[in-house]
Amino acid sequence: MSRLRIYTESGELIKDITDPKEIAEELQKINVLFERWRANAPLKENASDEEIINAYKHEIDRLINKYGFQSYDVIAMTPEHPKKDELRQKFLKEHTHSDFEVRYFVYGDGVFYLHPNDKVYILHCTAGDLISVPPNTKHWFDMGENPNFKCIRLFTTPEGWVAEYTGSDIAEKFPKYEEVVNG
């Protein structure tokens, strides 16, 4: 189940929301898009990237037309991935991008931390969730110690996004994936 928790920078809980419509409304206030998608055809558990793209093509095309995305792909992360620890550490540092960061969770989950102002928004994304983080928004991502997800990603440039780290240690002050998901 998707869940948004909003904290002060010092860690005081302000709001805790589980209703997808309310999550979308709250995130819209900081220009973050949150939607729930459904495939236009049933997907097998071992669906190919092409089958996944085709199942969500109507939604992908809608976002391409609205935001001018130039490319998209499917990324998978499993507990067996040889670089999972290295990638987790990279994503756990607060950063920005000059491009949108768009993820649709086909299956599995992950936690986005958004820090656009004097608050921290912790969003646990689950299968069926789309999040679009606007350019230059401070954020970080935690996929957990044993990641298991498949996502569609969309980009406005063919080379995708490049992280620009802020140097802040704020990510160390908030709960990691395991505590967010199990807490």
Curated annotation (Swiss-Prot):
Family stated for the protein in its record: Belongs to the acireductone dioxygenase (ARD) family.
EC number: 1.13.11.54, 1.13.11.53
Pathway: Amino-acid biosynthesis; L-methionine biosynthesis via salvage pathway; L-methionine from S-methyl-5-thio-alpha-D-ribose 1-phosphate: step 5/6
Protein name from the UniProt record: Acireductone dioxygenase
Gene: mtnD
GO biological process: L-methionine salvage from methylthioadenosine; L-methionine salvage from S-adenosylmethionine; methionine metabolic process
Cofactor details (free text): Binds 1 Fe(2+) cation per monomer.
Swiss-Prot/TrEMBL keywords: Amino-acid biosynthesis, Dioxygenase, Iron, Metal-binding, Methionine biosynthesis, Nickel, Oxidoreductase
UniProt: Ni(2+) binding residues: 95, 97, 101, 139
Originating organism: Aquifex aeolicus (strain VF5)
Gene3D superfamilies: Jelly Rolls
Marked site (Important to generate the dianion) residue numbers: 103
Residues holding Fe(2+): 95, 97, 101, 139
Annotated site (May play a role in metal incorporation in vivo): 94
